Design a protein with these regions (language model features):
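Extracytoplasmic "Venus flytrap"
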Residues: 25-42, 62-67
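N-terminal secretory signal peptides that target proteins for export/translocation
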Residues: 1-2
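Short, polar/charged alpha-helical segment
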Residues: 33-58, 120
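Sec/Tat signal peptide C-region and signal peptidase I cleavage site
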Residues: 14-20
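Conserved functional loop/turn residues at catalytic and ligand-binding sites
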Residues: 17, 54, 79
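Short helix-initiation/N-cap motifs at beta->coil->alpha
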Residues: 60-73, 154
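Sec-dependent N-terminal signal peptides
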Residues: 5-14
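Contiguous mixed-secondary-structure segments that line small-molecule binding/active-site clefts
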Residues: 44-45, 76, 81, 86-160
Length: 160
């Protein structure tokens, strides 16, 4: 059900013509065999299936079209219609609150993360993108950050 809602929102965002096929360019910067890469291909397949071919999602993995720092501008000018960026990429657009997701120790686990992203806070953050010409469709899990050091990292102060 959630996938159908996301797909419907994507179709509205790009404007579906009655007879013409709509092409959605979906750019991301990770390899095709990663969870995000596989999910983007799955999305493309479901879009074609659920729209009976009226929507074709072209997936461009591994920075094939744009590098990480170029993707957001490409989205804003319409060169691509979908991205799956790191949430921190929305900070330079003036929505600095998204940068909080990159802080260590902010969530205890994935369930804790989902309480925020799938609740009122997540919806409020998504709404802040719309005045910038971006319609957020969903939060994708991208795994927690991993750090390594020569000494144990147990508190924020240990990262200095």
């Amino acid at each position: 059900m959630k996938l159908k809602t996301i797909l419907a929102a994507a179709l509205l965002a790009v404007g579906l013509s009655v007879n013409a096929q709509t092409i959605i360019k979906f750019s991301h910067v990770v390899a095709a065999d990663t969870p995000k890469g596989k999910a983007s291909v799955f999305f493309a397949q479901k879009a074609a299936e659920l729209t009976k071919g009226k929507v074709k999602v072209e997936v461009y993995a591994n920075s094939a079209l744009y590098k990480d720092k170029e993707e957001m501008e490409a989205l804003q000018i319409g060169s691509v219609q979908m991205l799956a960026p790191s949430l921190a990429k929305f900070g330079p657009l003036g929505v600095k609150e998204f940068e909080a997701f990159d802080l260590p120790f902010i969530f205890d686990d994935t369930a804790d993360l989902h309480k925020v992203t799938q609740g009122p806070v997540g919806a409020s953050l998504m709404a802040k993108l719309e005045p910038r010409g971006i319609k957020g469709l969903a939060y994708w899990d991208n795994g927690f950050k991993s750090f390594s050091a020569n000494t144990p990292l147990k508190a924020v102060a240990d990262y200095k």
